[in-house]
């Protein structure tokens, strides 16, 4: 379902559908049905999508499969989605403060928003759980993964991958990069995280083992000598 403001022009709608079709083609997906509505109820495009897929039962990964003493891997870099949105919506303001190349690079972060490539590699490797990091950021994902599995975790904050563009833009707007929308980054629990990281890096996907699960209840974040709890 696509709801568009009454200020939208037909070329914009055509471009939107073209982008959607091209993306689906890359991912070997199809758009089955849709509804488009022009209304003065919304001020910017509002899109709702329901995706349906299937997989072999033996390949199903759920949070309940996470066990103590597993590695926690984060792919690509956190904050990609929020960074690219801010760079596009506040481009003029940001370019008064930062070099144009930094903002232009941040605008292009939307090229990393699909997690299909790493999910395919993770399934082939054999993992316990995969979690797309969205609203609530990486801190929210840590909490959701640990609470859903009933395990504790300990994470090294300094190992969490983040781009300098995200750091600069978040500092400018006074937002926490660990709590912003991070679509494009995936959190994975696996027995041999370092081997999975090696496979991901071979495929050109940055990934880091940031911590481990444990049998306790605490969700611990370490930053050098400092310790905090989620």
PLM regions with names:
Residues 1-230:
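Helix-biased detector of long, well-ordered alpha-helical tracts
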